[in-house]
Amino acid sequence: KADEAVKVASDAGQIVEKVLVWRRYPDAYQSEVPMKPGRDFFMDEYLPEFSGVRVDPVQLDADAALFLMYTSGTTGKPKGCQHSIGGYLTYVAGTSKYVQDIHPEDVYWCMADIGWITGHSYIVYGPLALAATSVMYEGVPTFPDAGRPWRIAERLGVNIFHTAPTTVRMLRKYGPEAPQKYNFEFKHMTTVGEPIEPEVWRWYYDVIGKGKAAIVDTWWQTETGGFLCSTMPAIHAMKPGSAGPAMPGIHPVIYDEDGNTVAEGSGIAGNICIQNPWPGGFQ
């Protein structure tokens, strides 16, 4: 796909000078697309040069760009969202600490794709800013079998777990036997990315959390940088299948299609709008 991506970029006026190619096994290049000398480089050949090397940080303005991430495109053409350094990092560190209860001594595992905003905010920047151990894995949760997540949790001593309802549903199909084979204990679990049905929530709580772990059901978007709505552990009561209230400092309102406020408790669907700025919002 690299040649296609380079052509698309070139047609848009962006010249790609170098392409880094990752080989799973050194000296084993299996793609049918030939490497282009001078443009394509095997990443594994250069990694040893930087192993153990300390890279001094570069001082930048708080409002300087940190990354550009595109939305999923589920509701239209993907849109590029640019996040800043200072505001974004402040928000994901704060929400990681107060919503997910992450501390330096914790071993935290978010099973999201690192290329998704959840992966950026809650695999990389949030937990690492708090000096916690952040687990990363490759592949899918059910290969070679459905016990894989729980083996990893047992082996690494994971005590905070973060995943999406789709993954919980998939693992639930295999029954409680797989997780019951392994010795792990989560103090806290997060659900993110979509609504979770009450019966799926209860399985997550009873089987994976063993009836002990606090669950936070979060709502947010690529554009928001971090959680906007969620219960707070030990403060709010958990409600199966329901995302929590607005985060501290976040003031949402529901509007109908004509811009009128939807009354609380009316049962009418509307559009969520946030009435105030917050540090994690995209630029």
What does each of the following model-derived ranges do?
Residues 16-27, 35-70, 77, 87, ...:
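Conserved pre-ATP/AMP-binding loop-to-beta segment of ANL
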Residues 89-107, 117-159, 173-176:
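Conserved AMP-binding/adenylation subdomain of ANL enzymes
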Residues 65, 71-74, 96, 108, ...:
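Conserved S/T- and glycine-rich ATP-binding loop of Class I adenylate-forming
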Residues 47, 132, 159-163, 172-240, ...:
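Gly/Ser/Thr-rich phosphate-binding loop
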Residues 1-5, 80-82, 133-141, 170, ...:
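Short beta-strand->loop structural element characteristic of the AMP-binding/adenylate-forming
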